[in-house]
Amino acid sequence: VKSRTFLLLLSVTTSLFAATKASKTHTVSVGAVRRVPYTQPDATADEKADETSSLKVRALFVDDRQKDWTTGELHEITDRTFAIRRALHINDALPSDTAPHWIWQPGSWITVDRVSGHITALHLPDFDPIVSNAVWFRDYAAYCGTASTSKGANLYVIVAQLGSRRAVVQKLIGRWPQPNHFIPVCQPAKWERLPLRVTIQPTGDEATTYDVVGTSSIVEEGDNDDNN
């Protein structure tokens, strides 16, 4: 009887411990803005000599532990999930260099779950860190992107939706790369709610409006703790 009682108590204790661990709420925050030197990766030698440009970066924390560097403003997708762009600290040293040469570059996008602390890397279609400046609305992101084909690379207008592998909108607007291209390549997208559509203008060219026909929001928000 004592043995059975002990096993029962052990089972209850284990279940309570597992439930407490699974329901643990994490604290997610971003730090203060820090300005760091930044040069466009495809800049000319003269442009690279100009060290006046900078990138605003902020640390991303989960439970007071830094998980990543970010840049730009975060976008609240739901009341518990937000998207934010990564900032990469890259060693740009050549094999012949004797010391590391660290540079900052904007990276891809991630989503962060405030409850579970889970961080997910987003693979937005045709997203190019040099070209793409995503503007969000709900779970949609609109931007100009690039993609390579057997005949070369092209520049596209892209509207992506989270959870969808293919772009909701993909419109060819030119070849890429372009000599002496504008920076930015495209102006920030402008969204309209009803009807759902977005206007994108390549810099120096005419703006075009695209109707967006997607699905209902399919952002997956789980309660599982991934030990972040």
For the regions a language model picked out, list residue spans one by one.
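Hydrophobic h-region of N-terminal signal peptides that target proteins for export
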Residues: L10-A18
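Terminal domain-start segments
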Residues: A19-H101
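Beta-strand C-termini and the immediately following turn/loop, strongest in propeller blades
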Residues: R86-L88, P100-I103, Y143-S150, T199-G204
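Repeated scaffold domains used in trafficking and secretory/extracellular systems
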Residues: D68-E73, D126-V135, Q178-P188
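Blade-terminus and WD-like Trp-Asp/Gly-His loop motifs, strongest in beta-propeller folds
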Residues: L74-T78, S132-Y140, C186-V198
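Bacterial N-terminal signal peptides that target proteins for export
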Residues: V1-L7
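Mid-length scaffold segments of soluble, non-membrane domains
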Residues: S116-D126, V131-K151
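Surface-exposed loop/turn elements that mediate protein-protein interactions on large endomembrane-trafficking
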Residues: V36-K67, W104-L124, L155-R175, Y210-N224
